Amino acid sequence: MVLEAVEEDDGWATNRVALGKVILGNLDGVEAGVRQMIRKAPLEVTKVELPSGAEVTVPTLEEMLRIKAFLVVRRNQTRDYLDVAALAVVLGVDRAAEVLGQINEYYADQAHNGDGVASQLVRQLGDPRPADSQVITQLPSYRRLRQEWKDWDTVTETLGAVAARMATG
């Protein structure tokens, strides 16, 4: 999308492309760079009032879920799977699946193969294989992790339920 748009300009000459990150080139003899955005829509935020009376702007729970789910696809780390499972329980599996079923409206297809983020997410949530899988055995020793999430089977059951619901719509 971005690459095609800049290459349509007669004065543009592409030098290097790092997909999903940056396009470097020349625009009428001037070195230029364009950052490719992975988001297709702005963050959904809400204001929260702190006990002090100050207000902070934070992502909505649904947005937090989308961010963490995208990180599952992008980073494939245990901590992201844990966060998706925990947020799915807070929102409810049906609502979480509904939110994640629409993730393609928020994030661009990073693989550029037409499958979209949602398809890859269903695969990864349905069969979680984090790149840092050695961390899974350490979950019981995490001090501030809620007891239910120290059991990887609980995490995978929750993620599997979300994936199944996403797949069936």
Where are the regions that the model predicts?
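Compositionally biased terminal segments of proteins
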Residues: 1-169
